[in-house]
């Protein structure tokens, strides 16, 4: 039986990180985790990483699509944080963001990792940005690296 499974190191890969500025005190921690992972575990040099900042989570898919269409990147790490408030806005923002990023990955056929926190409150967001529940930026970077290698193994 042939098994195709990705590995983490991808030293030649070119990665874009697109991050929302809204809730930057959380997102900055996600970026730190992703960058550390890409450099240490992915063995990717600084010059092969591009960081793009957008206003909010709704803008992540459009920026990711433009990055993917440029054909300059092997994978995209999308990072952000949407915290539930007192209105239905949370559902619209988180749903459209997730759907848009998935669509970019499918259309461009490159990995687009969903590292957008969707939490009930600020405490949950803090926990997932490097404290009690790990750092989801790290997880998104690892997923991107592994999927780059899986896609390369699968061929054109």
Swiss-Prot record:
Highest taxon listed in the record's lineage: Bacteria
Protein's pathway: Cofactor biosynthesis; riboflavin biosynthesis; riboflavin from 2-hydroxy-3-oxobutyl phosphate and 5-amino-6-(D-ribitylamino)uracil: step 1/2
Keywords: Riboflavin biosynthesis, Transferase
Gene Ontology molecular functions: 6,7-dimethyl-8-ribityllumazine synthase activity
A Pfam family of this chain: DMRL_synthase
Residue positions binding 5-amino-6-(D-ribitylamino)uracil: 22, 57-59, 81-83, 114
Positions bound to (2S)-2-hydroxy-3-oxobutyl phosphate: 86-87, 128
InterPro entries: LS (IPR034964), LS/RS (IPR002180), LS/RS_sf (IPR036467)
Top EC class of this enzyme: transferase
E.C. code: 2.5.1.78
One biological process term in Gene Ontology: riboflavin biosynthetic process
GO CC, one annotated term: riboflavin synthase complex
Active-site annotation: 89
Catalytic activity: (2S)-2-hydroxy-3-oxobutyl phosphate + 5-amino-6-(D-ribitylamino)uracil = 6,7-dimethyl-8-(1-D-ribityl)lumazine + phosphate + 2 H2O + H(+)
PANTHER family documented for this protein: 6,7-DIMETHYL-8-RIBITYLLUMAZINE SYNTHASE, 6,7-DIMETHYL-8-RIBITYLLUMAZINE SYNTHASE DMRL SYNTHASE LUMAZINE SYNTHASE
Stated family: Belongs to the DMRL synthase family.
Subunit structure: Forms an icosahedral capsid composed of 60 subunits, arranged as a dodecamer of pentamers.
Protein role: Catalyzes the formation of 6,7-dimethyl-8-ribityllumazine by condensation of 5-amino-6-(D-ribitylamino)uracil with 3,4-dihydroxy-2-butanone 4-phosphate. This is the penultimate step in the biosynthesis of riboflavin.
Designated name of the protein: 6,7-dimethyl-8-ribityllumazine synthase
Organism (species): Tolumonas auensis (strain DSM 9187 / NBRC 110442 / TA 4)
